[in-house]
Amino acid sequence: LLGPSISWFYNWGNTVIESVDAALIQSYDVDYCPMVWNGNYNEANIRAYVANHPECKYLLGFNEPNLTDQANMTPEQAAALWPNVKQLADELGLKLVSPALNYGTLAGYNDPIKWLDEFIALVPDNGIEVIALHCYMGGAGGMKSFIEMFRKYGKPIWLTEFCPWNGSGESVNSQIAYMSAALPYLEKDPLVERYAWFIPRYYGYPYMALISEYELSDVGKVFVNMTTMDQ
């Protein structure tokens, strides 16, 4: 359903889920990006996927390391593991995407800039070519300001999770209004290279899902009809 309207995807994993994801690659030539979600990634799966899909271009870094219920890593912990991630990417000819950052819950690291600055200082030879961000602010203006904070790194931005989500009061209409304001900005700002709406399929998120019960949701219909928006 989404295949004609997207150019890439990921699934927070090291490889595709054949029963769910394979058709996107085979039928629509969509670019899949494996991820090292935390330090406990399956290197063999990544190597096998890239061997079978030489068109693979990127390796995504740790998922929200400054959130305690996600990768939950201090800059020091992430930096200690990063040389192995870089070596893997180098051997496979993949471009490295930074750990994906949002405002966090890890003590001392609510500020994603603080986390990233410390991480980069610890691993200056990090090979990062793209900065990944997550943003759940309620308005497109706040999202734009958040992205602008990371312009100083001089690298393309991938917004790999975004939607308006404050824990209460969400509605289909608020998701559509936000999307209608956010996507034109994301498409036009040359700083933003790729983006991925949260969430494509219904996993207990009734308002923001693009697909529900095997058909496009109302939000999904807006997304599909806006996407010449194909980043």
PLM regions: where:
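Active-site groove signature of glycoside hydrolases
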Residues: 53-75, 95-106, 126-135, 159, ...
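An active-site-proximal structural segment forming one wall of the substrate-binding cleft
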Residues: 37-61, 71-91, 110-128, 176-189
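Active-site-adjacent beta->alpha loops and helix N-cap segments on the catalytic face
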Residues: 14-21, 74, 141-146
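Active-site clefts of carbohydrate-active enzymes
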Residues: 34, 97-108, 152-181, 198-213
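N-terminal carbohydrate-binding/catalytic regions of secreted carbohydrate-active enzymes
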Residues: 1-59, 84
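Loop/turn elements at helix/coil->beta-strand transitions in domains of secreted/extracellular proteins
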Residues: 3-8, 28-32, 54-58, 90-97, ...
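Aromatic- and acid-rich polysaccharide-binding/catalytic face
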Residues: 11, 34, 57, 63, ...
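Aromatic-rich peripheral "rim/lid" segments of glycoside hydrolase catalytic domains that contact
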Residues: 23-34, 38, 169, 185-231
